[in-house]
Amino acid sequence: QPLFQRFQDNGCILADDCSLTLLVDIKSSAEATYAVLARQLVQYADMLSVTKDDQFQQRSVTVIVSGNRPLESIASSNPRYACVDGRLEDLNQSKTSLLYPLISDNWRLHFRYRGQGEMPQAERDKLREVVGQAKTQGKRLRFWATPESPDLWQELLDAGVDLIGTDQLTRLHDWLRSQPKR
């Protein structure tokens, strides 16, 4: 409701007219929860990015469903007011960025580097390869369960990872503000 009120008052959410990404992390039953979510999203359709008949229209808020994702229910919705948070294995399949605009995965399942000292070159190369795959497919990339480390944040930033996840928001904010403009 607060986002919708801001949208109604200003005609947008963010000042630069970019789309805000709203990640909805489903922890309970995927199908039952999505059924409720889908009904709620329709009420805010004016501000939500939408895919209809395979045509995407970006609006003020783009909803991405994460966690327990009801893949077929989301994919078959038309119009569709939510997208799917993909996994790294989705990069090796022909899954469109219209349905999978974001790829998220558990850092610890794919990398041994824990943010202390220098990242091994083989892992740095692997990270850059994954980033390249995502960008080539028009998808954004993020990892969860990352170490809370400026050394790792620097590696993610240098590699071009789109979103850096953290539980230490102030610390990451201050660190990002200290970085040179890119």
Language-model features: where?
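Catalytic cores of phosphodiester-bond hydrolases, prominently lipid phosphodiesterases
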Residues: 1-182
